């Protein structure tokens, strides 16, 4: 079997385990690795019984070794990847895997901390460090932490998030040193997180007044960047432009009480948009509730609108709702 490369062995194994399992394996590979294996697979004309038997025997042997209690998982993983992908690609993939693993516990710690405690922990760091940390957090947690900063720091950090392009190698050592202290020795990976989409998602979760102030601050620095962020945002009032079928799908997911409170702060055209996509009975009940429900706090209205927007974003990402043509500008 000495004439078989690691890629050849991987192809034989993938063709042996069946289409469904092979597809699952591909989901965990990079685009380049998928292309390499696919190209090799396309060139396969015949696999001898001996080649098949040898590859399966080697795989079984290594799988049994992996099951031993004294196995070094990292060394085993490195060995398997080198055999399958070659030294260079294996090193790159393993680095990504281990960095992602190391990132998780430190970031999860911040995700589960009270926003005030997390804000106190990082507020004195350089704004770029803060931005780098926040892009790795859940969007709602990042928004809550930003809300606790003073306006100047909040605007500075948000601008850095919007222009974030990953951690440059030259800055990695300094960043790691800071995070070693803040996050109990865990490192943030050099990632492609951040950027306009991340900024828009975080701003969408801020209070309306803070949203407007942040957008204004970014616009003063870079008008084009501010517009890109706005284009990525989707505001509650923009639902008036969504097609009826999408509204009907949204109504299947939204709690009636949540919708009632959200619409208390909406203009009449948007109210009518929802009403005409309901059954007659449901529409009549909602009209009565809107007319008879007393005043509702603005903060409560905003919270329900933002909760509905999270559902909108989820449905849009799965293709169950259409929220814009790509040419629309939301302001």
Curated annotation (Swiss-Prot):
- Please name the InterPro entries in this protein's record: Flg_Motor_Flig (IPR000090), Flg_Motor_Flig_C (IPR023087), FliG_a-hlx (IPR011002), FliG_M (IPR032779), FliG_N (IPR028263)
Name a GO molecular-function annotation. cytoskeletal motor activity
- Positions occupied by motif Part of the EHPQR-motif: 125-128
UniProt main location, coarse: membrane
Give compartment(s): Cell inner membrane; Bacterial flagellum basal body
Q: What is the effect of changing residue 252 to W?
A: Decreases binding to YcgR, significantly improves motility in a pdeH disruption mutant
Note the Pfam families from the entry. FliG_C, FliG_M, FliG_N
Gene Ontology process terms (BP): bacterial-type flagellum assembly; bacterial-type flagellum-dependent cell motility; bacterial-type flagellum-dependent swimming motility; chemotaxis
Q: Where is this site: Part of the EHPQR-motif?
A: 160
Q: Name one GO cellular component term.
A: bacterial-type flagellum
The answer to whether keyword Metal-binding applies is no
The membrane topology of this protein is: Peripheral membrane protein
The answer to whether the entry has keyword GTP-binding is: no
Listed A to Z, the keywords are:
Bacterial flagellum, Cell inner membrane, Cell membrane, Chemotaxis, Flagellar rotation, Membrane
Q: How does it assemble?
A: Forms dimers and other homooligomers. Interacts with MotA via residues in its C-terminus. Interacts with flagellar brake protein YcgR.
Provide the function of this protein.
FliG is one of three proteins (FliG, FliN, FliM) that forms the rotor-mounted switch complex (C ring), located at the base of the basal body. This complex interacts with the CheY and CheZ chemotaxis proteins, in addition to contacting components of the motor that determine the direction of flagellar rotation.
PANTHER family attached here?
FLAGELLAR MOTOR SWITCH PROTEIN FLIG
- Family designation: Belongs to the FliG family.
The family database entries (NCBIfam families) matched by this protein are listed as: fliG
UniProt protein name: Flagellar motor switch protein FliG
Native species:
Escherichia coli (strain K12)
The gene is: fliG
């Amino acid at each position: 079997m000495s004439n078989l490369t690691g890629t050849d062995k991987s192809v034989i194994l993938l063709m042996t385990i069946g289409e469904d399992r092979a597809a699952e394996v591909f989901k965990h590979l990079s685009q380049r690795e998928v292309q390499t294996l696919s190209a090799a697979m396309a060139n396969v004309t015949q696999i001898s019984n001996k080649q098949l038997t040898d590859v399966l025997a080697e795989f079984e042997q290594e799988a049994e070794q992996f099951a031993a209690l004294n196995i070094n998982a990292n060394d085993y993983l490195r060995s398997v990847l080198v055999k399958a992908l070659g030294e260079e690609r294996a090193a790159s993939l393993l680095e990504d895997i281990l960095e992602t693993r190391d990132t998780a516990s430190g970031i999860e710690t911040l995700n589960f901390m009270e926003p005030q405690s997390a804000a106190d922990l990082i507020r004195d760091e350089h704004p770029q460090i803060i931005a780098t940390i926040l892009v790795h957090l859940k969007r709602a947690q990042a928004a809550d932490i930003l809300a606790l900063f003073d306006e100047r720091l909040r605007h500075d950090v948000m601008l850095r998030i919007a222009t974030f392009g990953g951690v440059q190698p030259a800055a990695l050592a300094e960043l790691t040193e800071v995070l070693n202290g803040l996050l109990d020795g865990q490192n943030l990976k050099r990632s492609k997180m951040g950027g306009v989409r991340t900024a828009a998602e975080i701003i969408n979760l801020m209070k309306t007044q803070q949203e407007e102030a942040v957008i204004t601050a970014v616009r003063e620095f870079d008008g084009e960047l501010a517009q890109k962020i706005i284009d990525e945002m989707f505001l509650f009032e923009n639902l008036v432009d969504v097609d009826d079928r999408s509204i009907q799908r949204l109504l299947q997911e939204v709690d009636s009480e949540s919708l009632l409170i959200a619409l208390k702060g909406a203009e009449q055209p948007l109210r009518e948009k929802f009403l005409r996509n309901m059954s007659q009975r449901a529409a009549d009940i909602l009209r009565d509730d809107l007319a008879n429900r007393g005043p509702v706090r603005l903060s409560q209205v905003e919270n329900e609108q933002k909760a509905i927007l999270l559902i909108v974003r989820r449905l849009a990402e799965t293709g169950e709702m259409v929220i814009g043509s790509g040419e629309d500008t939301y302001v």
